[in-house]
Amino acid sequence: MMYLHKAPHRAWWPSPEKFAEFYEKEFPEPATLFDDYSGRGTAAKTAEMNILTHMQYMHDSKVRPETIKVMGKVEPEIVYVRGDGSLMYPTAQGFYGPFGRANNEQKKKYDVTLDKISQDFKENWPNMNDKEKMQWKFQRYMQDYLATISSVDDNVGRVLNSLDAKKIADNTIVVYTSDQGFYLGEH
């Protein structure tokens, strides 16, 4: 039997309960969070790994599209360059696509935390300097990413508990595989 989880890659939408729980947590910043990659090769300088300039407000940080619209232009503007040189701007679909998969009960639970995120963003973002913006986005990233990881951990635990309960754990081989995961702001 194979049992597979969605890798905890974008979009990070943990359960509404984990979303609320981890939103209240604050995570330590890695020493390399503000690295500007000066003196490094082209690959390191051009990789889309900068939390401030590459993580999207709606898709990654879960700021409601309506909040972005009311605020007008939000700095820094997030723009991606496609392989053909054309520009790609994030859209509200990055938020509504994943959110739209939730049922009504889940959406009501998500709404409580989403309202807090959007209100905090609207009130504080315009007065933040770039360092504070990076710190804000880093916390949002860690909260969502680690909540997603925690959800995977919980469900792997459920499988292992089920194997024990059915008394087949000793006759079962469990193999864990993964990719390298996402950087947690460090490198």
Regions found by a protein language model. Give the residues of each.
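Active-site-proximal cap/lid insertion segments
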Residues: 4-170, 175-187
